């Protein structure tokens, strides 16, 4: 085990000099004793002359030149398997929930090759989420990748927590949650939410929160992914939740300049597409088992053309776009039904009825969007009878796309609803065919199935 010495410390980036014949490999882990703490460094570059440039997986405060650094001769390894369920771990797989050792039987390196093309499997099976707007407009595939896109404060994390709750309870598989650079409060809320709904023993939690150094945030997604890969390779269908994939990119940006790379567009790292690809190519389903992943993607300044969200788009099967305009109308989940897409929305996959209903809903909402200008200038009275009907139905559909969430019961005071896909299609089809033209639009707001809307109308 070779030993080197620290020669330079710049923030999270540490240069270490080793003997010429014992230079560590790229991605090898190094350990340094920093006071009472053992700090792990990960090799990023070999600079020549026996010097390697590393990123610290923790705070580099207190490091000084001349400290001894040991080469561990393997990449960062984390616990995998059933022992991780119900536990909260950090980027190195160390428990941070004060419940003692993990007691794992096996450890895996966080840097692994993606499965080969022969091993990949293609599934057409749908994953029902119980959220009307998602199941209808942008259905998820089992073993597919989903992105939740949204600016600040439109409900990415709440949507994700609802998805985890619904899928964990209805689907009863294992899940891995990687909190990448998000709020500590959300991590705490999430843990208690999982405990209260009795699904904590089916979830492994890996946190690298906002207050952590960039090294932790850059690698914590890989730690969570490695745990999910282990479950997949045991032949299970596992769910991987990443909140937030943008912070993974951002952590890369923070260390990129310190590593001496020239910035590219908007100041991002030049290796943006490659870093994203390395992560996304591993999140995939094989013939052995499947990983269904849901990733929250923060959209800076609500601009979907920003390089980070734009790079993420390319890897996804379904995109759920959360819109500030819809949130401002008080419609939650604030999913934009005209902007959200899914590869599964194909008559050969979801069936003709589902496809026609979804497209019908989109065309009515699109027509309403076009008529809004006329209404704003001339008022409703100037519309033809046919257009008045379209507007009335569109407003009902818009309200019926809202739904009370289980995880938001505390804030809204109304109990959460899980709506099956069959009921969702039936409800929207009925509105489009005019079966509910006699009901006031307020009856459709924040209800589950169409029967509830009919009941609510009686009370209004």
From Swiss-Prot:
One of its GO terms (cellular component) is proton-transporting ATP synthase complex. It comes from Shigella dysenteriae serotype 1 (strain Sd197). The keyword Cell membrane applies. NCBIfam families: atpD (TIGR01039). F-type ATPases have 2 components, CF(1) - the catalytic core - and CF(0) - the membrane proton channel. CF(1) has five subunits: alpha(3), beta(3), gamma(1), delta(1), epsilon(1). CF(0) has three main subunits: a(1), b(2) and c(9-12). The alpha and beta chains form an alternating ring which encloses part of the gamma chain. CF(1) is attached to CF(0) by a central stalk formed by the gamma and epsilon chains, while a peripheral stalk is formed by the delta and b chains. CDD domains: ATP-synt_F1_beta_C, ATP-synt_F1_beta_N, F1-ATPase_beta_CD. Pfam families: ATP-synt_ab, ATP-synt_ab_N, ATP-synt_VA_C. Gene3D superfamilies: 2.40.10.170, Bovine Mitochondrial F1-atpase, Atp Synthase Beta Chain, Chain D, domain 3 (1.10.1140.10), P-loop containing nucleotide triphosphate hydrolases (3.40.50.300). It is a peripheral membrane protein. Its EC number is 7.1.2.2. Produces ATP from ADP in the presence of a proton gradient across the membrane. The catalytic sites are hosted primarily by the beta subunits. Keywords: ATP synthesis, ATP-binding, Cell inner membrane, Cell membrane, CF(1), Hydrogen ion transport, Ion transport, Membrane, Nucleotide-binding, Translocase, Transport. It is found in: Cell inner membrane. GO terms for molecular function: ATP binding; ATP hydrolysis activity; proton-transporting ATP synthase activity, rotational mechanism. Belongs to the ATPase alpha/beta chains family. It comes from the Bacteria. InterPro entries: AAA+_ATPase, ATP-synt_VA_C, ATP_synth_F1_bsu, ATPase_a/bsu_AS, ATPase_alpha/beta_chains, ATPase_F1/V1/A1_a/bsu_N, ATPase_F1/V1/A1_a/bsu_N_sf, ATPase_F1/V1/A1_a/bsu_nucl-bd. This is ATP synthase subunit beta. ATP binds at residues 150-157. It catalyses: ATP + H2O + 4 H(+)(in) = ADP + phosphate + 5 H(+)(out). PANTHER family: ATP SYNTHASE, ATP SYNTHASE SUBUNIT BETA, MITOCHONDRIAL.
